[in-house]
Curated annotation (Swiss-Prot):
Domain ABC transporter: from-to ranges: 7-385
Annotated ATP binding sites: 40-47
Taxon lineage: Bacteria, Bacillati, Mycoplasmatota, Mycoplasmoidales, Mycoplasmoidaceae
Subunit-level organization: The complex is composed of two ATP-binding proteins (PotA), two transmembrane proteins (PotB and PotC) and a solute-binding protein (PotD).
Gene: potA
Organism for this UniProt entry: Mycoplasmoides gallisepticum (strain R(low / passage 15 / clone 2)) (Mycoplasma gallisepticum)
Protein name: Spermidine/putrescine import ATP-binding protein PotA
Amino acid sequence: MEDKVFIQLRNVNKTFDDGFVAVRNLNLDINKSEFVTLLGPSGCGKTTTLKLLAGFEQPTYGQIKINGIDIKDMPVHKRPFATVFQDYALFPNMTVYNNVCYGLKIMRVPKENTDPKLAVEAENIKKEAEKKAAAKIKDLSRKKNDLSNKLDKIRKEYEKNDWMLENDEMRFAQYQEELIKLEAQLSEAYEQSEINKLNQEIVELKTNYQKKIPIDNRYDKVLKELENADGWTSYWETYPIMKKEHFENKVLTRRLTKKEIEERANNMIKLVGLTGKEDKYPSELSGGMQQRVALARALVIEPETLLLDEPLSALDAKVRKQLQNELKRIHKELNITFILVTHDQEEALSLSDKIVVMSQGDIEQVGKPNAIYDSPINEWTAKFIGAANIFDGKYLGDYKIELNSGDIIDTDEEYEFKKGDNVRVLIRPEDFDVVEKDQGFFNVEVIKTSYKGVLWEVECLMSDKTKIKVDNIDEVKVGAIVGLKFDEMDVHMMRKEEEDV
């Protein structure tokens, strides 16, 4: 795999008209030929991020770079992407073969035996366009700098009022939502002290928001101007490429021949396992087969990147597993960049070279699957990515941790932790070994067992009444006192969140 940055997202933000921030100052590098998964719960911003890449949504601000060039102003059909959707989006009146051929009929390839002077002319057109673009970008850079300074001055006005600073992103929709919530609480309040408190909060909300409105209006106006200037910067960055491409399409490229279309379509149909289904209509196919058609239609036009928007979520477990294996195989064979959106942790862990864990519009952690699973950066990621036992403890130094139960355990990691730091400790259920009483690092009482088909899920109680879950091959009797062992490498420390300290 090429270790070369291909796609860069820089300070990408998407705020909708109602004030909802779907993606917040997102920064991400994606390498050429990498299989990257955007993983997170519903509403975390992963699908919005994919739409921003594809061009179906425009960022409020920020840069989306391909090979160093900001493409956020580039039309959808000009971007080096193809998208596979969750609902397949097949043409119901076309056969499998015609669905796959659809993009090939407008695809262009280089002409053979062209005059070399035409290629030189194309480069000259690009160079002239680059000169023009450079001058425009320079002017826009000065304008953006002035606008950024204006925004900084307006931000300082928010800082004069603690309420405004805390609620700087609040606009009318959020204000109404907060007001309705407080009024609903007031209508249900009985005690006079609570009624007085809520009335005071409502008065403060109304007063502070009225003071904030003129500042918001000035801020939003300048921000809009900055976004517009940023959009034009993106336009001029892609301008030389577009000018060259326009010339090449007229004199240096051609449409595919009927024979070439047939050959490419048949090869792709074979690659995705649709041989024999060419004359079927989508309505005659299972969900899994329809998704294969959607995959073939996207890949046949030879995109540099394939965007996958939860393509397997509507399929049953068996078919989903089969298609996961197919995706992995196809990615390996084609060696192009795949970007997958999913909420399925197992899917992300099994398919990805890199996982991007998202929550509430922010990136929580980026890393290889094993790093995300074994060394999550915080408790939220640890619990989201898989079953997790989280203990409170104190780092004693010398790779030793004292749990709140009083038990002292070893770890093989230290990172930035110092002696005396309060920590969260992660041990996955599968990392425990059940042994005889007093033969482990500490004893626990078995309070519940459940057979999961391959392993027993054993729920235990520690001496400080902390509940933990253990995966075990053999059944353990409820009420038994057993010992638990684990390897030092399976003990992962996380910093305590500020509100927990």
